[in-house]
Amino acid sequence: MPQTQTKEFLSNHPLFRTDDLDEARHCVTQKFCDHKLFLSSKGDQLSVHHNHVAGKYVSVNYLHYGANVQINPGMLERFYLLQIPLSGHALVRHRGKDIVANRKTATLLNPDRETDMIWHKNIIFL
C-alpha cells in the first residue's frame, strides 16, 4: 500500500523555514523552551517547517525537521506538550519510559519531568 503524503497543516500560518540547525534551535526555543538539538545521522539535511497559531492559553504547532534529530529539552517547566504524530515515528523518553510515538500513539509531556526525544526524518507532529 503506498504511503500518502501528509498535508502541511496550518500552512497559512508559517512561523519559519530553515535548513540551519542553530537557527532552528533558536526559533523553536522562542516558542517552546531552551533545548539541545542535534542531527542524529551524518549526511542528513535539515528542512524545518514550523507553522504556528497562538490562542490565549493554547497554541497549535505543525513541526517537521526533515532529518533525524535528537531533541533534549530537559524539563519543559511551564507547559504541558501534547504531540500528535501525523506521519512517521519518534522515540520519546519521558518519566523514565520509552514511548514510540506514531499515528496510533500521541504523547503528553509533563512540565516537571525530564524529556529526551529522537525524531525520525519522516515524523511530523501537530
What name fits each language-model region?
Residues Q45-L126:
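N-terminal regulatory/effector-sensing and dimerization cores
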Residues M1-K56:
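A short, N-terminal "cap"/entry segment at the start of jelly-roll beta-barrel domains
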